[in-house]
Amino acid sequence: MPEVERKSKITASRKLMLKSLMLAKAKECWEQEHEEREAEKVRYLSERIPTLQTRGLSLSALQDLCRELHAKVEVVDEERYDIEAKCLHNTREIKDLKLKVLDLRGKFKRPPLRRVRVSADAMLRALLGSKHKVSMDLRANLKSVKKEDTEKERPVEVGDWRKNVEAMSGMEGRKKMFDAAKSPTLQ
């Protein structure tokens, strides 16, 4: 039976309209996020940086204000330098550790994995823990079947082969063979 091509349940114009609506919504969300980020940035800066009032200050007061600002800038620069040094140290350490891992991978060969036969009891013990005593011997429910020895059922006649040829010749011999083939199944 040839495969039937599945037709889309939505027409191409409807797909295009939905796609344009989704893009418009995504653009709107992106613009809103951008505005929120800008507002958060302005709010953060207004909290951290107080407004400077330089009007009406004397020359000595302005110089003191400049010295304070320079001291703050120096402290911030020192902190920034310390953080950059720590980051650089950490990145170097990470790079060295990655190289060590690559070296160790090359030195050791992974052993070939072998299948391990786990019994159902061992699996349950591993899953449930050693406290739970659950036995799941699935072989106990199976019936025992004895193999029949086909060689024992048919006695092998060893005798003169000429007698067998004479006895089996003609229609009488065919009847004997047919009866012999039927007899083991009836017993």
From Swiss-Prot:
Keywords attached to this entry = Acetylation, Actin-binding, Muscle protein, Phosphoprotein
Q: Which residues carry this modification: Phosphoserine?
A: S58
The terms describing its cellular component in GO are: troponin complex
| MF terms in GO | actin binding
Subunit: Binds to actin and tropomyosin.
Q: Which PANTHER family match?
A: TROPONIN I, TROPONIN I, SLOW SKELETAL MUSCLE
Question: At what positions is N-acetylproline found?
Answer: P2
**Region (Involved in binding TNC and actin) residue spans:** 97-118
Keyword field contains Phosphoprotein: yes
Per the entry, what this protein does is: Troponin I is the inhibitory subunit of troponin, the thin filament regulatory complex which confers calcium-sensitivity to striated muscle actomyosin ATPase activity.
State the family it belongs to: Belongs to the troponin I family.
Q: Taxonomy-wise, where does this protein's organism fall, top ranks first?
A: Eukaryota, Metazoa, Chordata, Craniata, Vertebrata
Keyword Acetylation recorded: yes
Tell me the protein's name.
Troponin I, slow skeletal muscle
Source organism per UniProt: Rattus norvegicus
Q: Which Gene3D superfamilies does the protein's record reference?
A: 1.20.5.350, 6.10.250.180
Q: Cite the residue spans of the region called Involved in binding TNC.
A: 2-48
Q: Which is an annotated Pfam family here? A: Troponin
One GO term (biological process): transition between fast and slow fiber
Q: Where is the signal peptide?
A: none
